[in-house]
Regions:
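Feature marking well-ordered beta-strand scaffolds used for ligand recognition
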Residues: 1-224
């Protein structure tokens, strides 16, 4: 059968590229699209069946479009937009990375219009989006590192000397363990989340190398 590789691009002007590799000795570009704005990128995409999810992240907060777009790729030469999930807001750069392998849920490292970080660099966190109706994606659940959102009843974490932010970078959910999210959190280390109840992700364990061993979390419960 026909084999298509879908490629994300690190920065503008290109959005994504489809390469026909049915004959691996003769790869052929069959589709290439452009981003609508130069201040954004789409360096993360995933496909499942005839649906593709593409992450959009802007260079600065408050810009648009920022979020996630779903495409019908049943005809690789002519992908069609199904829906756009808007994540833009005054403290948001949109979606950095996403994971989509079951055709039902998109797991993503993302900002949100209603999330106000305690530090400007801590703007992205884990979100689970229900795409079983791809024309109407809806958030099911979310989780952020305690102390990184204004209003948390936890002290903000101490900053690293080389401060890259306490924010989500990658969220992996493998088919063998759909109830686990393996979440890379840059300066926050790595977390393993129980997502068996996707509306209420819970931390199971973590690995961290924070700069101060004296910093201790006061409470694991944070407002959503």
């Amino acid at each position: 059968g026909r084999r298509i590789i879908w490629l994300a691009h690190e920065s503008a002007p290109k959005n994504f590229t489809a390469v026909d590799v049915s004959d691996p000795r003769k790869p052929k570009v069959v589709c290439q699209t452009d981003l609508p704005q130069s201040h954004m990128r789409s360096n993360s995409l995933e496909t499942c069946g005839n649906i593709m999810a593409v992450a959009y992240q802007t260079q600065k907060k408050g810009l648009q479009p920022a979020g996630m777009e779903l495409f019908d790729i049943s005809n690789p030469e002519k992908p069609k937009s199904i829906s756009f999930y808007d994540c833009s807001g005054p403290h948001s750069r949109g979606v950095h990375q996403l994971w989509f392998c079951d055709g039902e849920y998109v797991h993503m490292a993302s900002s949100s219009p209603d999330f106000v970080p305690t530090h400007p660099s801590d703007d992205q966190f884990y979100r689970c989006i229900d795409v079983r109706n791809p024309s109407k994606p809806v958030e099911l659940g979310r989780w952020h590192m305690p102390g990184t959102k204004q209003g948390d009843n936890v002290m903000p974490p101490p900053r690293h000397p080389l401060d890259k932010g306490y924010r989500a970078h990658n969220c992996n959910v493998y088919p063998q363990r759909p109830d686990r999210c393996y979440l890379a959190y840059i300066d926050g280390g790595m977390f393993v989340l129980d997502i068996s109840d996707k509306a209420n992700p819970k931390r199971i364990s973590e690995w961290t190398r924070r700069p101060s061993a004296s910093w201790k979390r006061q409470d694991e419960t944070c407002p959503s």
